[in-house]
Amino acid sequence: MQIDFNSDMGESFGAWTIGDGVDTELMAFISSANIATGFHAGDPSTMRRTIEQAKRLGVAIGAHPGFRDLVGFGRRHINAPAQELVDDMLYQLGALRELARVQGVPLQHFKPHGALYMHLARDEEAARLLVENLQRLEPDLLLYCMPGSVICNVAQELGQPVVREFYADRAYDLSGSIVFTRNVRAHDPAEVAARVIRACQQGLVRTVEGDDLAIQFDSICLHSDTPGALALAQATRQALDGAGIEVRTPR
């Protein structure tokens, strides 16, 4: 069995660092990095350094655009027209793509951040407009999304390749949606690792309602801003390796 392991990277801004500031150490355990592109976190120099590090470690990179919300770290919903949101996302994609192009690193994927990710999971107008633009711009760019979400369905309809995600450090409800929160709590590394292995081997995750939910996915996501993220990533990777599950990029 093979699985992708992704995490959000480069979510610092100038002298400010999000979470435990463990990007450098955590990147050794993953196969794909979602690099913040300046609107919810990140700045040009941080983006450049994160690309350099990913290149050294052989980690694939993707754009991680968010709402224009530095203060709220992109976790606050912004009620903007679909065209404005797509303009902002393409602007952020272009910024990362050029910084990566200088270093000869191709972009593997595109993954919206936080509240924008959840918005596109539900809003068909914005999701369809984004995918239509990606089809014109980069029809082979992988789109990371929640399985069964609006944007996942639209992308599959229009032919944009998708990578369905499983969230190692977020709770699920019976609808199959992650339970979005602005107050991220710490997790026990052994419990997270066991949850991931169960999802990989059995295709099941326990929901907040206490029932099992069947889930299909291509990539495991673990957030670098979760308290204790490095220990979570290390425990998860060790569990995957121990179970004979190969961690590699989706293509």
Curated annotation (Swiss-Prot):
Enzyme nomenclature, EC number: 3.5.2.9
Alphabetical keyword list: ATP-binding, Hydrolase, Nucleotide-binding
Record-linked InterPro entries: Glyco_hydro/deAcase_b/a-brl, LamB/YcsF/PxpA-like
Reaction(s) this enzyme catalyzes, per UniProt: 5-oxo-L-proline + ATP + 2 H2O = L-glutamate + ADP + phosphate + H(+)
Intrachain S-S bonds: none
GO biological process, one term: carbohydrate metabolic process
Function: Catalyzes the cleavage of 5-oxoproline to form L-glutamate coupled to the hydrolysis of ATP to ADP and inorganic phosphate.
Quaternary state and interactors: Forms a complex composed of PxpA, PxpB and PxpC.
PANTHER family per the UniProt record, alphabetical: 5-OXOPROLINASE SUBUNIT A (PTHR30292:SF0), UNCHARACTERIZED PROTEIN YBGL-RELATED (PTHR30292)
Family: Belongs to the LamB/PxpA family.
Protein name as it appears in the record: 5-oxoprolinase subunit A 2
Species, as recorded: Pseudomonas syringae pv. tomato (strain ATCC BAA-871 / DC3000)
